[in-house]
Regions:
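Conserved catalytic core of the tyrosine transesterase superfamily
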Residues: 2-331
Length: 331
């Protein structure tokens, strides 16, 4: 029976699961997860349980199926995220003594194939970036930051927005690492950088110092007027550079995209680890943690390999993690 009225969507919970939801969220935050989106979704589940007058703690299979059912106009990604949350909560309930049904995550079919730059193409992009110049009518162009920015994207695999939101205090050139704060998964993480990349960052920092003195800018990547710039500006220069490097742009939704620096970093890193004799059983979890993913499965969309480029790596990966890259195996 559904209860009518009396329910207010907020951080307060009213169902039989209320106190346990709070414990669940706090248990995640202890490990650095902000869990803001999860908190909202848990509030919706709490309302659902309250409206359905749930009396016994423990998510039944029937309740899980009802909650996880696809909703009108709901995208595959949104539904998967919603199911992942209730799945995690059900697993938590099981761990603390309340048997619950742990639903399966809906299978997502993806035709997305990233563009993987060859090392030669990456080098051509970097060389071309060294010759970029601002237009005469736009002295405050972000162009002077682009050579360092793109090398950082390829050299670390971080996302463009993570790079553009770096503060000077987040770039540690003494110990060669950067700190990403409040990133996509709601937690801070430290990302090491190579000696050569640290030198590039140091040269850029020295070059930009004059602008920081004049405008008191805290952001690491800035324009000559001291102001930060967005991903749109970075993407504009990216399109220009791939043209200068002789790399064909195949259209919207196909690429190459700026985010493909992240995909390329992942593939090249796997290749390097394999060439150095590191077993794929160890290298995939290492890469997954480095990229800020919570599981090896999450690394799927970032490290798709093509049999043409890395057949040996693909074979090793398939043997250890079957179906991790299913769309490639079916070709």
């Amino acid at each position: 029976m559904r209860k009518k009225g009396g329910y207010k969507m907020s951080r307060y919970y009213y169902s039989i699961y209320g106190a346990l939801i709070k414990q669940f969220i706090e248990s995640k935050r202890i490990f650095g997860y902000k869990y803001a989106m999860v908190e909202q979704e848990c509030a919706r589940f709490d309302k659902y349980a309250y409206d359905n007058d749930e009396k016994v703690i423990g998510i039944s299979k029937e309740l899980a199926i009802q909650w996880c059912a696809k909703r009108p106009n709901e995208s595959v990604k949104t539904r998967r995220n919603r199911v992942q949350i209730i799945r995690a909560f059900s697993a938590y309930l099981c761990c603390i003594g309340y048997p619950s049904h742990v639903p399966q995550i809906p299978h997502a079919k993806s035709m997305f194939i990233p563009y993987i730059f060859s090392k030669d193409e990456v080098e051509k992009i970097f060389v071309a970036s060294n010759f970029l110049r601002p237009a005469e009518n736009n002295p405050n162009s972000a162009v002077f930051a682009i050579p360092c920015l793109f090398r950082l994207l390829y050299g670390t695999g971080i996302r463009i927005n993570e790079a553009l939101h770096l503060l000077c205090k987040d770039v540690n050139l003494k110990d060669n690492h950067i700190v990403l704060r409040d990133n996509k998964n709601g937690r801070d993480r430290i990302v090491p950088i190579s000696d050569s990349l640290a030198i590039v960052c140091e040269e850029y920092l020295k070059h930009s110092e004059q602008y920081r003195i004049n405008y008191n800018s805290e952001r690491f990547f800035i324009k000559p007027n001291g102001k930060p710039f967005g991903s749109e500006a970075a993407y504009k220069w990216f399109r220009k550079l791939i043209y200068e490097a002789g790399i064909s742009y195949q259209g919207r939704g196909i690429g190459p995209r700026l985010h493909d620096f992240r995909h390329t970093f992942s593939v090249h890193t796997l290749a390097s680890m394999a060439e150095n004799g590191l077993d794929m059983y160890y290298s995939l979890p290492i890469l997954s943690a480095y990229l800020g993913h919570q599981s090896v499965a999450s690394t799927d969309k970032y490290v798709r390999l093509t049999a043409e480029m890395f057949p040996l790596i693909l074979q090793k990966t398939n043997e250890l993690f079957p179906y991790l890259f299913p769309e490639i195996y079916k070709r």
